[in-house]
């Protein structure tokens, strides 16, 4: 009862074909593949961006403290 048999999967597949039609399912899968490819390309673009260059010059700030307490 807990697992689905082959007949259950065939019925689900038949219902999906009736709802979406024969041409719509490959189109949906193509859109999913394009989305995944675009996501991977975006992730690779982020990794190729060089980190900002760090400044090698140091700064010294001089300040005299107020001695009136």
From Swiss-Prot:
Keywords in alphabetical order: Cell inner membrane, Cell membrane, Membrane, Protein transport, Translocation, Transmembrane, Transmembrane helix, Transport
Family membership: Belongs to the TatA/E family.
GO biological process: protein transport by the Tat complex
Gene Ontology CC annotation, any one: TAT protein transport complex
Keyword Manganese in annotation: no
Single GO molecular function: protein transmembrane transporter activity
Record field: transmembrane: 1-21
Protein location: Cell inner membrane
Basic and acidic residues bias locations: 60-69
Protein transport is among the record's keywords: yes
Gene3D superfamilies, per the entry: 1.20.5.3310
Highest taxon of source: Bacteria
Function description: Part of the twin-arginine translocation (Tat) system that transports large folded proteins containing a characteristic twin-arginine motif in their signal peptide across membranes. TatA could form the protein-conducting channel of the Tat system.
Pfam family of the protein (one): TatA_B_E
Quaternary structure (record): The Tat system comprises two distinct complexes: a TatABC complex, containing multiple copies of TatA, TatB and TatC subunits, and a separate TatA complex, containing only TatA subunits. Substrates initially bind to the TatABC complex, which probably triggers association of the separate TatA complex to form the active translocon.
Record's bilayer topology term: Single-pass membrane protein
The protein's name: Sec-independent protein translocase protein TatA
Cystine pairings recorded for this chain: none
Sequence segments annotated as region (Disordered): 41-69
InterPro entries listed in its UniProt record: TatA/B/E, TatA/E
């Amino acid at each position: 009862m807990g697992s689905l048999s082959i007949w259950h999967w065939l019925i689900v597949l038949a219902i999906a074909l009736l709802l979406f039609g024969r041409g719509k399912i490959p189109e949906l899968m193509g859109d999913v593949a394009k989305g995944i490819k675009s996501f991977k390309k975006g992730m690779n673009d982020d990794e190729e961006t060089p980190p900002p260059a760090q400044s090698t010059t140091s700064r010294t700030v001089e300040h005299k403290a107020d001695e009136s307490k």
